[in-house]
Amino acid sequence: MKAAVLVFPGSNCDRDLAVAIEKICGTKPLMVWHQESELPDDLDLIAVPGGFSYGDYLRSGAMAARSAVMPAVIKQAERGVPVLGICNGFQILTEAGLLPGALMRNAGLSFICRNVGLEIQNTTSPFLRLYKKNQKIHLPVAHHDGNYTADEATLDQLEDEDRVALRYTESVNGSARNIAGVLNKKGNVLGLMPHPERMIEDAHGGKDGYNMFASLMQVMA
């Protein structure tokens, strides 16, 4: 599997994500600097990592979404290439228009860094096929702006089209309807605030994030 991990000024989870992809998928991903304007045509995955791109100035992900590399990401996503945005990556994908809604300041106005309970809502996305519907998992979060917000019509549409990927099992940050991750209409773009790459082996406290990458491998096989 050929994967690319984007790197922006302020990214700090890009190496963790690259290690997870290499460990599970067996190939070392390309590390793509944000100033690149092209991506290889034969990619099987584009991963947008967590961190604080551009220091979260203006809004989280707002400046990164306007980086030189993003038109190529949008083009590949429209072709059906799987795109995974984690934490700041999720924020970037919403700012770029690849996913609906926005990530606002946490309801408690504080940075949240802990493991949280999640419930799998969708099992048809290439990232989620090895999970079971309504399966309970735990993944770590580490964010200040993870409060998912959208208007009621958009939220209803996400529910009706089975595009809510994961839901918190409790109110973590004030997210509308406890949404932790959403999909685009095709199902090939996933954005989520929790960090699956930080929980892929028992030494990390569990392997609940492993199947998010293994699912994609199964689809590509």
UniProtKB/Swiss-Prot annotation:
- Record-linked SUPFAM superfamilies: Class I glutamine amidotransferase-like (SSF52317)
Active site positions, chain numbering: 87 (nucleophile), 195, 197
Which chain regions cross the lipid bilayer?
none
Which reaction does this enzyme catalyse, per its entry? N(2)-formyl-N(1)-(5-phospho-beta-D-ribosyl)glycinamide + L-glutamine + ATP + H2O = 2-formamido-N(1)-(5-O-phospho-beta-D-ribosyl)acetamidine + L-glutamate + ADP + phosphate + H(+); L-glutamine + H2O = L-glutamate + NH4(+)
Q: Reply yes or no: does the keyword Thylakoid apply.
A: no
Query: What EC numbers are recorded for this enzyme?
Result: 6.3.5.3, 3.5.1.2
A GO cellular component annotated for this chain's UniProt record is:
cytoplasm
The chain positions of domain Glutamine amidotransferase type-1 read: 3-221
Protein's cellular compartments: Cytoplasm
Q: In which pathway does it act?
A: Purine metabolism; IMP biosynthesis via de novo pathway; 5-amino-1-(5-phospho-D-ribosyl)imidazole from N(2)-formyl-N(1)-(5-phospho-D-ribosyl)glycinamide: step 1/2
The UniProt entry, under SMART domains, shows:
GATase_5
Has the keyword Nucleotide-binding been applied to this entry? yes
Q: What keywords were assigned to this record? A: ATP-binding, Cytoplasm, Glutamine amidotransferase, Hydrolase, Ligase, Nucleotide-binding, Purine biosynthesis
Its chief place of residence is cytoplasm
UniProt-listed NCBIfam families: FGAM_synth_I, PRK03619.1
Assembly, per entry: Part of the FGAM synthase complex composed of 1 PurL, 1 PurQ and 2 PurS subunits.
- Protein name as it appears in the record: Phosphoribosylformylglycinamidine synthase subunit PurQ
Organism lineage reads as:
Bacteria, Pseudomonadati, Pseudomonadota, Alphaproteobacteria, Sphingomonadales
